[in-house]
Amino acid sequence: METWFLYFITKSISYALFMVLIVTFLESLALVGLFLPGIVLMSILGTLIGNGTLSFYPAWIVGIIGCMCGDWISYYCGFKFKKCITNLHLLKNNNVVLDKITNTLTNYPITTILLGRFIGPTRPLVPMVCGMLNISLKTFIIPNILGCILWPPIYFLPGIFTGIAISNTTNYSENTYFKIQFLAAILLIWLGIFLLWKLWKRYTDTGKKKIYISNVNLCLLLTISLSAGITIMIYIQSNSTLIFFRKILWKILISSQ
């Protein structure tokens, strides 16, 4: 699938923008998004931005439109066809996920609508469940729009860096020490974010679960991983390779029209 997708989008910029619209729309569409490898497809599109084939801002705007269309249609479907949706075989097999989304939406609607967009399994479900719960448009629309604005560039980012790296291999291929530091910083920061999410889930999940690590130790690991990752990231800011990457990234953002 990814090979065919890459072949299609490299044929024309118009095709690429059309695929940004389709991918972001289907990723956000109720239930359909569960079956798409969103991070893979968005990273491929981000690679085209990184190597200069596709402009950043048009792709971002098209991505926002696709996200909003998918979310708002999902919200309408949840509101209009609640009874039909609850009888779907797919949802009956995923009652645990649906119940968790329902509980968090009931207690933390704005936070769940915003953060739910960035979590793969919940992205195509949260707007639909909002409609099913009759959550008001006033509550739904602001965090939804904010999530739709932030989601495309965040998911483009891995591909953008990959595109820059592929197009400029001679500028960093020998700097192995920098690559190890950079990778370690990214992994530690992502670990910290993951632990923060796990800690948040513990405080919001009312069900009883086996706890293999105490909250104190979890907070300690969270603090250490984030502190170490941020410290390494600050330390390598003066590295010539990172300076080069920043210049290329800035050029992509400034020159895009």
Swiss-Prot record:
Keywords: Cell membrane, Membrane, Transmembrane, Transmembrane helix. Pfam families: VTT_dom. Disulfide bonds: none annotated. It comes from the Bacteria. The chain crosses the membrane at residues 5-25, 29-49, 53-73, 146-166, 180-200, 216-236. Belongs to the DedA family. This is Uncharacterized membrane protein bbp_130. The lineage of its organism: Bacteria, Pseudomonadati, Pseudomonadota, Gammaproteobacteria, Enterobacterales.
